[in-house]
Amino acid sequence: MDLKSLIRDIPDFPKPGILFRDITTLLRDRQGLRYTIDFLAEKCSEANLNIDYVIGMESRGFIFGTPLAYKLGAGFIPVRKKGKLPAAVHSIEYELEYGTDCLEVHRDALHPDSRVLIVDDLIATGGTASATAKLVQQIGCELVGFGFIIELRDLQGRKHLPDVPIISLVEY
């Protein structure tokens, strides 16, 4: 299936000069959504990642991470922006182009030596994915890979990620 044909391009969003890759058109397509989850699960199985948990990055990582976890027989754990989780958290601050941001995960969500796959809809510069990787590694988890629906190759996000399998289904 040609997933690119199901992803809408929106020029000048959220600001002039940016070409936004809109996944809502992929999400509304029944066959496209099913194929996306099945294909990502197949790639994870082929890589023999033996995942305990899928980590979904806020917020579109939740959309793909939850059904992927189900398909792989793993648990799903959300990583959220600061202040969005109600219980005690592990957190990490990371650099943005202009300032910093913070990611959090519940303290009781992950256990040392858990094998985790980090999932999001898109990798661009790799900043958020890299911070999520550092967060789960600080907890003592084994990061076994990343899964992305879209990869923006020109932004070279891969070079900021640990040396583990990186699965992307569509490249621009």
Curated annotation (Swiss-Prot):
Keywords: Cytoplasm, Glycosyltransferase, Purine salvage, Transferase. It is found in: Cytoplasm. One of its GO terms (biological process) is purine ribonucleoside salvage. Belongs to the purine/pyrimidine phosphoribosyltransferase family. GO terms for cellular component: cytoplasm. It comes from Nostoc sp. (strain PCC 7120 / SAG 25.82 / UTEX 2576). This is Adenine phosphoribosyltransferase. Its main location: cytoplasm. It catalyses: AMP + diphosphate = 5-phospho-alpha-D-ribose 1-diphosphate + adenine. GO terms for molecular function: adenine binding; adenine phosphoribosyltransferase activity; AMP binding. Pathway: Purine metabolism; AMP biosynthesis via salvage pathway; AMP from adenine: step 1/1. Catalyzes a salvage reaction resulting in the formation of AMP, that is energically less costly than de novo synthesis. Homodimer. Its EC number is 2.4.2.7. The keyword Transferase applies.
